[in-house]
Curated annotation (Swiss-Prot):
InterPro entries: BG1-like. Involved in auxin transport. Positive regulator of the auxin signaling pathway involved in gravitropism, plant growth and grain development. It comes from Oryza sativa subsp. indica. Residues 90-106 have a biased composition (Low complexity). Residues 81-141 are annotated as: Disordered. This is Protein BIG GRAIN 1.
Amino acid sequence: MERWAAPKVTAGSARRYVADQPSFSSTLLDAIYKSMDEQPGHGGGATGVEAVAAAAKKQHEAALHYGYYYKPSLAGSYRARAPGPHATTSSSSECSSYGGFSSSEAESSHHRRLRPIRTTVPGGAPGPAPEKKAKKPGASIRAKLRDLRKPASPGARLAGFLNSIFAGKRAPATPPSATAGAESACSTASSYSRSCLSKTPSTRGQAKRTVRFLDSDTESLASSTVVDRRRVPVEAVQQMLLQRMEMESDEDDDESSDASSDLFELENFAAIAPAGAAYRDELPVYETTRVALNRAIGHGYGHGRSARVV
């Protein structure tokens, strides 16, 4: 086989070659004519015809292979691009000993250029600063309400509680002002995550309060008098308890005497009875305090009979 130097193939030439691709019959006729020119005086034998057919078939397969890989759609993508310094082109050609037809393949790869990084600032006067929109009073209230919804950490709560305690101890005693603001925002010194809106109560229809400043001696004396008034004497309490106990004991004695009045009493009738009476033998026993029964018992003893009423 004889290798021919193929010209450089570009994207445009490859497209034109694909458009002008010969058919199988034309390549077969070209191969037959060339074989006849190479062997003058000899008739086309069977071996010559087979060789020509094999060469034509091989050329046709090469043409189909080239047409498959180099389509017009692919060639059109290279039309707008010019081969740059980074483009590489490689070509290879094959030719048969039986004909002058040659097939070439070309591959070109283009590397995209990277955009340069801007390292300089374009000179010129800076543009006007955007105007700040005026804040509405409603926006601040909404922001405070959003802060109320945010959860506070336990450390911030503890710090705020301690700061409020120490601030209350250090603050001097000042009279409450009657004309206070209607609404005031209060927040701790350590954390601004929580805020509350407090409204001072109105002082209309209430009694006026007065504040007096006293010296340390006067203040101690006033406090001692108040304590003495509140203190109850111990001796008075003891006397009251003793009187109460005596009254209770007297009531108990009265109740016991009333209960003993129903019991029997023994009287010595022998001292007043005449001599030789029956009272000397035994004493009358009264088991009741009823006067009618006592008289009946005494009447029975007066007749010389001894009777015991059960």
